[in-house]
Amino acid sequence: MYAMQGLDVVERVELHTPFGAPSDRYVVGALAGQLVAFLPRHGIGHRLTPTEVPSRANIHGFKQLGVRYLISVSAVGSLREDYAPGNIVIPDQIFDRTKGIRPASFFGNGLVAHVAFDRPFDQQLADRLYEAAREAGATAHRGGTYVCMEGPQFSTLAESEENRRRGHD
């Protein structure tokens, strides 16, 4: 997914951030009359493993470009039988199993902050995404808990069963 249908590319931007280099160059262009920026999280050619993705640099780069809303698309598995392959799920919660494995904050080195994260996703944006998916004819599910785990492997059957018992989707 390195070309977005309907995107008129204006420029490709290489940025440097306080957190290192982003995954690749940003593609900036117009989509349905809106200025958008796109970045392949794993780099062109899918060359970065999930652990190697420089998430903080990627996010900071979007901030440098003036991006106000960030939408991340992932190909994932489901813990629910009623979620079929190709369905779109717009979660409202996240269960992060990567803590301690990769940097989890923009703070540190003398910069201390405590950030509320009880509602990690913007609900108005999520509502707009849900409506857009439905209008496009997609089967979309609103709400649910996304389990973020360290890849590149997927969960074992035992891990999946535990996540299902916890009510994750």
Task: Identify the role of each PLM range.
Residues T17, P50, F121, G151-P152, ...:
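Residues that cap or flank secondary-structure elements
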Residues P120-R165:
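Active-site rim beta-loop-alpha module in soluble metabolic enzymes
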Residues M1-F117:
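Metabolite-binding pocket within alpha/beta catalytic cores that recognizes anionic/polar moieties
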Residues G66-Y69, R165-D169:
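Short active-site oxyanion
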